[in-house]
Amino acid sequence: MILSDADILRRLEQGDLVVEPLDDPDIQIQPASVDLRLGHEFLEFQHANIPCIHPNSEDEVSDYVEETVIEEGGEFILHPGDFVLGTTHERVAIPDDLIAHVEGRSSLGRLAIVVHATAGLCDPGYEGQITLELSNLGTAPVALTPGMRISQLTFTELKTPADRPYGAERGSKYQGQSGPQASKIQGDREFGGDQ
């Protein structure tokens, strides 16, 4: 079951679902979603002259990105074909009986802005800011302003709560993240990690 605005408000008031700061609930809470705003931090992928990135090499992954912080009132220009990691302004905490889906806003989609490449899911138990995988599929640069509504979060109720939710017990590598996070895929078992 997808939560309606009334369901979302009830869960927020109960405190088991967290979206904060929720500065303007009348605007941000939609009929079946919550609009999330763009944060100030971005990780830009460098145009590197390297043959490839090896996902199991933390150094190669971290050397490939550079952090940019946009000051209040500033803009981040997303050029055609570019891919950057951004973050939501809000921090979320998803209870064990819900799953959250990150979706783009249709108004930005009509400007060819995509807010997630593949990671559109927040597992039960996830806590932290949400990293956005932003790309411009259009032919013109688009100015993104921190604080603008950039995405929406919908919530689906699970039939039963997760037995092993995302979090410390599972060693979840993105739990509690603040700001955009580069890939930590080198922590996966197939690359010698423990996850």
Swiss-Prot record:
The active site is at E133. Pathway: Pyrimidine metabolism; dUMP biosynthesis; dUMP from dCTP (dUTP route): step 1/2. Its EC number is 3.5.4.13. Gene3D superfamilies: 2.70.40.10. SUPFAM superfamilies: dUTPase-like (SSF51283). Keywords: Hydrolase, Nucleotide metabolism, Nucleotide-binding. Pfam families: DCD. Residues 159-195 are annotated as: Disordered. GO terms for biological process: dUMP biosynthetic process; dUTP biosynthetic process; nucleobase-containing small molecule interconversion. Residues 160-172, 186-195 have a biased composition (Basic and acidic residues). Coiled coil: none annotated. It catalyses: dCTP + H2O + H(+) = dUTP + NH4(+). It is an enzyme of class 3 (hydrolase). Residues 174-184 have a biased composition (Polar residues). GO terms for molecular function: dCTP deaminase activity; nucleotide binding. DCTP binds at R105, S106, S107, L108, G109, R110, D123, T131, L132, E133, Q152, Y166, K173, Q177. InterPro entries: dCTP_deaminase (IPR011962), dUTPase-like_sf (IPR036157), dUTPase_trimeric (IPR033704). Homotrimer. Catalyzes the deamination of dCTP to dUTP. PANTHER family: DCTP DEAMINASE (PTHR42680:SF3). Belongs to the dCTP deaminase family. This is dCTP deaminase. It comes from Haloarcula marismortui (strain ATCC 43049 / DSM 3752 / JCM 8966 / VKM B-1809). The lineage of its organism: Archaea, Methanobacteriati, Methanobacteriota, Stenosarchaea group, Halobacteria.
